[in-house]
């Protein structure tokens, strides 16, 4: 889908790759970059920084609260018009604890923001897109939703669920012959504050600009699924082909992925 003259709403758009994608959307001629974020200071700073590129609107929204989402969407449409492109980018990883040490609050927060929130936001906007028979929803998930990883079990579960939901909705729309498109993006670790302390000795940690460019390109091409880097498309193939102990040895010990969270600190 083209970004030119489109209203582009990005959850978590006040920082990280969300902010970068908003800038790129404006550079491609978007009518308005609409930020939904929990951080008012971040929204204000991003609006000031990106206003030279085009129109930027921002709203403080707890995307894990369905009532808040519906009210915010109504206000957004009143102020900015229909949303043409939705990018569900808000996400959280709470700690590097093993599952037995995870608190109820950490589990609930992770699932609410990473899994339930994009469902709430998409459900609020999808009916209008379907009525217009035009629109695009891009869900930023994670390679952690395809590859099991110790010390991030709840995060991995939240992203596995998000991938399954996102691609299932894609097929529903396909069966409806709708021109509304769904893109699921599953990037490896990104060098943002969210992943501070992550170690990856073999596979390079991704640069935010690199990821943002590939997400924008995937939306423009109506790509159904995009692993970043591309090699992650083949994870499930290798899981099917290799015995579990060989798969674990290669990805865990040789590639070092199973130890990536050992020194994780995250955003403070």
Where are these regions (language model features)?
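Active-site helix of classical SDR
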Residues: 122, 158
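Canonical Rossmann dinucleotide-binding motif of NAD(H)/NADP(H)-dependent dehydrogenases/reductases
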Residues: 1-34
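C-terminal helical subdomain
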Residues: 184, 200-236
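Conserved glycine-rich Rossmann-like NAD(P)H-binding loop of the short-chain dehydrogenase/reductase
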Residues: 30-45
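The beta1-alpha1 cofactor-binding region of Rossmann-like NAD(H)/NADP(H)-dependent oxidoreductases
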Residues: 40-41, 60-72, 104
């Amino acid at each position: 889908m083209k970004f030119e003259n489109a209203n582009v709403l990005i959850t978590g758009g006040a920082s990280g790759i969300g902010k970068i994608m908003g800038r790129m959307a404006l550079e491609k001629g978007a009518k308005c970059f609409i930020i939904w974020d929990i951080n008012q200071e971040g929204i204000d700073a991003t609006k000031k920084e990106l206003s030279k590129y085009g129109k930027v609107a921002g709203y403080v929204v707890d995307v894990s609260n369905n009532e808040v989402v519906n009210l915010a969407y109504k206000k957004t449409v009143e102020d900015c018009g229909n949303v043409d492109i939705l990018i569900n980018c808000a996400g959280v990883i709470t700690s590097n604890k093993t599952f037995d040490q995870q608190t109820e609050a950490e589990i609930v927060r992770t699932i609410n923001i990473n899994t339930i929130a994009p469902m709430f936001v998409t459900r609020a906007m999808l009916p209008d897109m379907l009525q217009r028979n035009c629109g695009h929803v891009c869900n930023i998930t994670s390679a952690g939703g395809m590859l099991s990883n110790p010390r991030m079990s709840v995060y991995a579960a939240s992203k596995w669920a998000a991938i399954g939901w996102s691609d299932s909705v894609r097929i529903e729309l396909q069966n409806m012959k709708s021109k509304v498109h769904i893109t699921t993006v599953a990037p490896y670790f990104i060098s943002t504050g969210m992943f501070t302390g992550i170690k990856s000795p073999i596979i390079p940690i991704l640069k935010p600009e690199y990821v943002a460019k590939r997400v924008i390109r995937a939306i423009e091409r109506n790509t159904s699924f995009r692993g970043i880097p591309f090699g992650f498309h083949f994870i499930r193939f290798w899981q099917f082909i290799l015995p579990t102990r060989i798969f674990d040895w290669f990805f865990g010990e040789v590639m070092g992925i199973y130890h990536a969270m050992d020194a994780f600190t995250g955003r403070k």
